[in-house]
Amino acid sequence: YCTILKVNNTDGQISVSDSTLHLQDVSEATIYLVNETSYNGFDKHPVKEGAPYLENAMNDACHLVNFTYDELLQRHLADYKKLFDRVNFQLANAKFDKVRPTDKQLLDYSDYQEVNPYLEMLYFQYGRYLLISSSRTPGVPANLQGLWAPALYSPWRGNYTININLEENYWPAEVANLSELVAPVDGLVKGLSITGRHNAQNFYGINEGWCTGHNTDAWAMSNPVGTGNESPQWSNWAMGGAWLVETLWDHYDYTRDTDYLRNTAYPLMKGACDFLLNWLIEDPHNPKELITAPCTSPEADYITDKGYRGSSFYGGTADLAIIRELFKNTIKGAQVLGIDQAYAE
């Protein structure tokens, strides 16, 4: 990776020592910051097949200095406002608090159950701001940390936890009128559908379809993770793909874009179904029903009446709810497209 700082429009002296930029006797300066990495897609080695990040960073920096601060600000606002200004959300009795900072209002809201409609409005729009700011890069959706992180190695590596976190990042996207910001999820799921075929074969012995565990990254890692004494309550889970493709169905459901359904959502949903059709087994207590086993409920465990504490079991509600929803929507998709009638039946 590479970060470049370039200074322009200053009346003082500029010098550099080691990794420090010094500005002396300066009354005004425009500092341009450019970040680039060698990331070149989920299936490209960042060193052997990486993007020319040094060249790209230098080119961007040389290009940016042709713009003044005001010009860059206006360009940014034009890009941002075309998304943000789509929604005007108002609640009755909402009043702006000129005295307390937002963090104090949050504490009073959470700890003392204060009624604060204005804070609820603000939080809704803050969520939209975060998604606008962190869901632009093809194939790289908003992750656990968002656009900025306080450390080089951010918590949980800044990856994607797909046993709820990534999905819930995008639950507001359609209803909050930010539909096109789902596109980075499409790219990630396409990558997972490729790596997930190897996952299905190597870990579960299933040669049809694809699946992924609870965690992935920009390289579309799909295998289960966890070593040593780490818990099966999160590592032993094969439903990540089945749940994540529901985000794609939601996008179709809101937009009614049949080209998107035909070319993107439906093939990925069907691939997830193919795996599940081979993963389901007959319930040993009721052969008329199909269940999953082994099964876990995301990051949960249970205690029996005899005091046994465990995580793995037969036919958990979460698994079956995800599967039922996916099967139902895949059948709907086949009907809309007029294809795969026998498969749907």
Q: What does each of the following model-derived ranges do?
A:
Residues Y1-Y160, L178-Q201, A334-G338:
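Acidic/polar, glycine-enriched structural segments that form the non-catalytic walls/loops
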Residues Y123-Y126, L181-L192, Y260-L276, L326, ...:
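Extended, well-ordered alpha-helical scaffold segments
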Residues L21, T68, D111-L119, R157, ...:
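Conserved aromatic-histidine-acidic binding/catalytic patches
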Residues L130-S133, L166-S179, A242, L248-T258:
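Alpha-helical support elements that line or immediately flank enzyme active sites
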Residues L119-Y123, N165, V182, G240, ...:
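Hydrophobic (often cysteine-bearing) scaffold residues that line and stabilize catalytic clefts
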Residues E120-S134, G241-D250, Y266-P267, G271-L276:
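Extended, hydrophobic/aromatic-rich amphipathic alpha-helical segments that build helical scaffolds
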Residues G41-G50, E55, N143-N159, E208-N263, ...:
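The feature captures the catalytic groove of carbohydrate-active enzymes
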